[in-house]
């Protein structure tokens, strides 16, 4: 990857807290990390994509520690979202009650391999998402998951 980037002379930008990229009706906000310390998972870049009236939150491998940092930073205003990419493959180490209460996703997507050795997603995570009536999709069950949006509505389609 870096060989191709260097060959093309592409300028590299490191994502930083509060960075914003705008293009037409799309806005991309960086919500995390505020600094790089602790575990690699908790240094995951957390991105909020606003497409018109539809909001997505991509949490990478962020765990409860990173969620807590975002919740206590007054400069980070986590949005209520339609679509949440669940942190850390649906592990019990991610998705705190406070984080869920604020983001309140309609759709939650986790990424995990079938019969993975970590047992992802963990039942506690599925239960928490079920309690808020989120529609739950996972790559282990649904295969490829595609979200299509026109900025006013969205639809979910799956491979399986």
Give residue spans per PLM region:
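Non-globular, low-confidence helical/coil segments that flank catalytic cores
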Residues: 1-160
């Amino acid at each position: 990857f870096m060989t191709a980037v260097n060959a093309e002379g592409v300028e590299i930008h490191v994502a930083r807290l509060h960075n914003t990229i705008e293009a037409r009706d799309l806005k991309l906000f960086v919500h995390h990390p505020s600094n790089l310390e602790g575990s690699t998972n908790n240094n995951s870049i957390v991105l909020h994509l606003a497409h018109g009236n539809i909001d997505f939150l991509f949490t990478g491998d962020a765990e409860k520690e990173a969620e807590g940092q975002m919740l206590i930073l007054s400069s980070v205003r986590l949005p209520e979202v339609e679509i949440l990419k669940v942190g850390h493959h649906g592990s019990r180490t991610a998705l705190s009650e406070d984080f869920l209460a604020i983001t309140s996703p309609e759709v939650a997507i986790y990424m995990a391999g079938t019969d993975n050795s970590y047992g992802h997603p963990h039942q506690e995570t599925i239960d928490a998402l079920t309690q808020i009536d989120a529609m739950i999709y996972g790559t282990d069950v649904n295969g490829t998951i595609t979200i299509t949006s026109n900025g006013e509505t969205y639809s979910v389609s799956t491979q399986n």
